[in-house]
Structures are given as structure tokens and as C-alpha cells.
């Protein structure tokens, strides 16, 4: 779960949790927000609570930590990280919003790739992908995301798209092999 004001994020997140439970699994939520909340685990959990995402409301644990695992290096030599709790899970479902980025343009801006690289990469992931400046984000973001897909258990992504009124307009699951 991320830190940006996504419409209905608590309803969407709870629906994903319920779906996973219906399949017989034991879900947990990981704050996927890079360095937001001052890059502090408890502050990230508090940000989620502000969106109505609490353990009580979601019916599952929230495992908040800034600890990461190094997954490998991109083709451009960038280290790629992943939240340790997410990495140790049997599978990861990436929930996010797809929208244009406000500071760069490219084939992948704000969405699944950014959530995998920056959100689940925590502060280290954010620093790595931003280290060459915004001018190289359109190159680094998908390159780092490919390392995530190749070296972790991303089951699928379930992004939403909002309309011009910031209302949920579309939610569609994307199989991992169709992220790129």
C-alpha cells in the first residue's frame, strides 16, 4: 500500500486482502512508499492509518520495516532493493495507481514499475533509481523493475486508474509477464 492519496485505497486494499484469504492464504500488507514518512517504519504505518489502512480495518497484519534485500543490479549498474518482509512472502501483489509522473516522461512513469522499484525498494530503492537525476528516470525505472520481476515473486499487479475528478475509474489485474 502506498502513500499517495489514491481514491478508495482502503476499499481496494481490503478487497485484495479478502480475495487472498478466500484463496486460503494469509496476507499481510507492506507499506510501499520509498522514503515517505521520513523513511521511518512507524511513520509509514501511520501514513497508511491516515488512509484507513489499519490492521483492524484490513483484517490482516501490517509489516512495516525499512529493512531491504539487495535483489541485484540493473543493466545500468544500479542496485535494486526490495522490502525484506515482501521478499520473504510467498508472493507479492502490487497494488497502485497508474498516472503520469509530474517530473519526467517515459513509457513507465507512476504505476506498477515505480511501486516495485521505489515503493517496495524503500529509501534505498528510491535513492538508487533517482541517483542519476530525473533525466534518467525513464531509463532507470523499467531497468530496475525488470530486476525486481526476475528476482522476486511478483504474482501480479492490480493497478487502478482515476478519472479527471480523482475518482476510481478502472481497476484491472495485470499478470507479471504483461507488466512490460
What are these regions (language model features)?
Residues 4-7, 80, 135:
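Alpha-helix capping and helix-loop boundary segments enriched in small/acidic/polar residues
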Residues 11-20, 43-54, 108-118:
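A glycine- and small-aliphatic-rich helix-loop capping segment at beta-alpha/alpha-beta transitions
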Residues 82-180:
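Conserved, well-structured core segments that form the ligand-binding/active-site neighborhood
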Residues 1-45:
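N-terminal active-site beta-alpha-beta segment that forms phosphate/nucleotide-binding
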Residues 43-107:
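An acidic, phosphate/nucleotide-engaging active-site surface
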Amino acid at each position: 500500500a502506498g502513500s499517495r492519496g489514491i481514491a478508495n485505497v482502503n476499499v481496494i486494499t481490503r478487497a485484495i486482502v479478502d480475495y487472498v484469504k478466500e484463496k486460503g492464504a494469509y496476507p499481510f500488507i507492506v507499506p510501499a512508499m520509498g522514503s515517505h514518512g521520513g523513511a521511518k517504519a512507524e511513520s509509514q504505518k501511520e501514513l497508511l492509518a491516515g488512509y484507513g489502512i489499519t490492521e483492524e480495518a484490513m483484517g490482516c497484519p501490517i509489516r512495516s520495516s525499512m529493512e531491504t534485500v539487495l535483489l541485484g543490479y540493473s543493466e545500468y549498474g544500479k542496485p535494486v532493493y526490495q522490502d525484506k518482509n515482501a521478499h520473504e512472502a510467498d508472493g507479492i501483489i502490487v497494488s497502485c495507481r497508474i498516472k503520469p509522473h509530474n517530473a519526467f516522461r517515459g513509457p513507465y512513469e507512476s504505476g506498477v514499475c515505480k511501486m516495485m522499484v521505489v515503493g517496495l525498494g524503500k529509501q534505498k530503492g528510491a535513492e538508487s533509481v533517482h541517483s542519476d537525476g530525473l533525466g534518467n528516470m525513464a531509463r532507470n525505472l523499467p531497468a530496475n523493475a525488470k530486476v525486481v520481476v526476475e528476482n522476486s515473486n511478483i504474482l501480479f499487479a492490480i493497478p487502478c486508474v482515476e478519472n479527471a475528478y480523482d475518482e476510481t475509474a478502472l481497476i484491472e489485474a495485470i499478470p507479471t509477464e504483461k507488466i512490460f
